[in-house]
Amino acid sequence: MSRQGRFGGLMAGLLMLGTLAGCTTAATGGAYLLPQTTQAAAQRSVAADAPLLEVMPVQLASYLEGGSLVYQTDDITLVQASQNLWADDLQDMLTRQLLTQLKASPAQPLSQYRIADTSLSGLKGARLSVSLDRFIGRHDGQSVITGRWRLRGVDGSVLEEGDIQTLTPLTDDGYPALVNSLGEGWRVTGEQLAREIAKALPATADAS
């Protein structure tokens, strides 16, 4: 139980979020954006006729769609914060950051693909779908991201699929630390997805 001891202070701090969520004074509230990934500047250009990977909007469990930060206070209880909210649509933020990371990945043959969201009507390519059932803080001082991903080929067949499970320790108490931890967890998740997708995508003529 050394891990439990390590996060003892953080557990208390995360449980304090429940008190913050119940406060009615604006001073306790906040609106938060996910931290930007540091890879945005590393995105590379690819050939206009390169094969396409479409990234579907990240799907969220219904309780994550309300705009509130969510944390788990014990084994069975989830609490939605009433005063501490996402400043932008969570689905949009997660999808944008996933796109950024996939575009920046050096993994072959992924780096030879055009990567875009599904707004490019009329184009058809491989398709990545991601669904999350947990994007929360937890009473043991960690943020938790869990879900599933699936990669389909141009013909709709499943090329690969798998689970998502990323645990990231909080470095401090409070909502800002929770947001930073979730942001780091999503960055790590994006890197893991890029590696797994690269293994499953068909090679391109330019891939070495």
Q: Language model features by range: what are they?
A:
Residues 52-58, 70, 127-131, 144-150, ...:
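Soluble periplasmic/extracytoplasmic beta-strand elements of cell-envelope proteins
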Residues 84-106:
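Structured, soluble extracytoplasmic/luminal domains of envelope-associated proteins
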Residues 23-92, 200-208:
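A structural "domain/chain start" motif
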Residues 99, 103-107, 194-198, 202:
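Sec-exported extracytoplasmic/periplasmic mature domains
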Residues 1-23:
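Sec-dependent bacterial lipoprotein signal peptides
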Residues 77-85, 155-195:
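Short secondary-structure boundary motifs at beta->alpha junctions and helix caps
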